C-alpha cells in the first residue's frame, strides 16, 4: 500500500484580492512619457512642493512602506543582477521518500538564489539584503517586467523590497517597493498590478 506524504513546504497566507479603488492613475508628461496605476497603500507624494525631480516619483506611508519609480538610462549592472539571479539559482529538492511512499502532490519549485545583490546599490537605509525570489511578467503593452524579491532590513524591521524593471526605447523603467515582510501577502498583489500597468509612449 502506498503512503501519501504531504510535501514539506511552508504554508503561505492567501494573497490579497485587489480592486480598482486600491489604485489611482499617474502619468509623467515629459520625456519619456509614461503612466501607471499607483497603489494608495504606499502613501503620499514625498516630493510634493520640491523642485521638479524629472521622470521620478516617490510615495511613502512610513519608513517601512514606501516606493519609488523612475525612467532612467539603462544600467548594465542592474540588468546583470536580474539576469544572473535566474541563471544562478539552485532548486531546493524535496526530501527523499521511503519505500512505498509518494508525495500527495508535487509543489511549485523553490529556489536558493546565489547572486550577490550588493551591486544594486539600494538606498542606505535598506540593509541585510538577500534575494529570495525572481521572475518576470508582461505589461498591458506586452513589455517584459522583471522582478527581484529581496529580504532586507529597513528602519530596524524585517522587510521585503521588490525591484521591477522594464525597457522601451533605450530607457529603463525601474520600481522599488518596500514593505514589512510579515505583510507581503497584502503588498505583492499591489506591486504586481502597478508594474504590469506601465504604459510608455512609443
Regions found by a protein language model. Give the residues of each.
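Conserved polar/disulfide-associated segments of primarily extracytoplasmic proteins
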Residues: 48-179
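N-terminal targeting sequences that direct proteins away from the cytosol to non-cytosolic compartments
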Residues: 1-74, 135-137, 154-158, 168-202
